[in-house]
Amino acid sequence: MEGLVNNSGDKDLDEKLLQPFTYILQVPGKQIRAKLAHAFNYWLKIPNDKLNIVGEIIQMLHNSSLLIDDIQDNSILRRGIPVAHSIYGVASTINAANYVIFLAVEKVLRLEHPEATRVCIDQLLELHRGQGIEIYWRDNFQCPSEDEYKLMTIRKTGGLFMLAIRLMQLFSESDADFTKLAGILGLYFQIRDDYCNLCLQEYSENKSFCEDLTEGKFSFPIIHAIRSRPDDRQVIQILRQRTRDVEVKKYCVTLLEKFGSFSHTRETLAQLDREAREEVARLGGNPFLEAILNDLLNWDRTK
């Protein structure tokens, strides 16, 4: 909580305003974005005080985005507990999320670099462009191509990765270009999340079963199923229903398996894993990033 208080120092006010935000912090996530920042510092070698501020900024922006995502997606659970807006209401949750975004921008100013704010705004714009077009597809019922999906994902999921890297580069002597690696990681994280949402038991325990189907989301396996079987409209009709019926969702999962959509997704994940490792090696190797990639391979046990 200390790191969230604004410069006015009104702790009592902030405690009230930030209740929806601190609520989701009671069950910490995997801190993967903070781990990535520390991993990239193997190459960038910036001072710890700057690294810690960047890590705080990324975590604040990530967690605030989760509050908004859960409202936009009509989610029920987040990290195994009821979503914040089901406890504190939509209005307070939106305000808390927006407030934390500006607290994060205020923290960017503390980095005391003339380009830091511009970098932050650039990447937040990219993130919202990616998030926005994904919502547009869902709400207008337009199934994107895989290439359109990948561009959206690099903007949305890769946006915070690039924000961390670009902020760190402001204080580094390294001139390495990490754009390709950040894009690969963004794709890998999102496609892995799409796959695990439909296949991995622990996702069902922390969210509702196959939540992406209830949301009506054009996730990577869904896009493959719809695009590869244009004459079979079962999957797209199930998606249109935004169903909470577990039996219907289980049937959709069997269709995705039958259509080869899970197999295609696993092949894509394996390819992204290879590409990430090759890019890490090209950049000189990084044991911390390699360890993160190893940890992410839990999707492979769902075969």
Swiss-Prot record:
Presence of keyword Transcription regulation: no
Catalysed reaction, written as an equation: (2E)-geranyl diphosphate + H2O = (2E)-geraniol + diphosphate
Pfam families to which the protein is assigned, alphabetical: polyprenyl_synt
Superkingdom as given in the UniProt entry: Eukaryota
The entry's keywords: Hydrolase, Isoprene biosynthesis, Magnesium, Metal-binding
Any Gene Ontology biological process: isoprenoid biosynthetic process
Binding site for Mg(2+) 1: 69, 73
EC number(s) reported in the record: 3.1.7.11
Motif (DDXXD motif): 69-73
Residues where Mg(2+) 2 binds: 69, 73
Cofactor or coenzyme needed: Mg(2+)
Entry protein name: Terpene synthase
Record organism: Matsumurasca onukii (Tea green leafhopper)
Higher taxonomy: Eukaryota, Metazoa, Ecdysozoa, Arthropoda, Hexapoda
